[in-house]
Amino acid sequence: AGRPFATTLVGDASLSARPMERIAEPLRQMGACIETTDGHAPLTVGGGSTPLSGITYRLPVASAQVKSAVLLAGLSARGSTTVVEPVATRDHTERMLELPVLHVGAERHTTVDGNTRLRARQWIVPRDVSAAAFFVVAASIAEHAIIEMHGVGLNPTRTAALDVLRAMGARVAIVGEREVGGEPIGDLRVEAPE
């Protein structure tokens, strides 16, 4: 969005089944020309010579994907763009872009300044703690099992499954906690109960 060329975004069957109007609508409010296919992918983002305009967008439902789309589009918009979250969602985009988040009561307000140029840099993407949960469960119920997983993302917005498993008696240890690219990561060691 906001670039002088047209782009068509497609996806696999799973992605094409997801609703895209909830992402397209706030981008249209910013001035983007977006056409969906019956509200789904593929979608075409039309090029244009008019830059996007910053907006304040209140998420009608909790969605980290919509929030990220608006914030990333806001980087190339005129003025500032603010996303208001009535309920907190995953905060990977804010961490990656090092954005300040203002807490107003129970709400989170995240603002980006327009016409911001991103610098190229190298990123390390942590392993997905949601995918690791299956192995944590397996090791927790298999007799004499021990499993170690290195470099797992431990973003507090994604670790509830580990908390629940611990509460159920799973022996989950986190070692080597560190931060990479603004994201907390660590190594998981899971042992079957004695």
Which residue ranges define each predicted feature?
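Structural preference for solvent-exposed beta-strand-turn elements
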Residues: 1-194
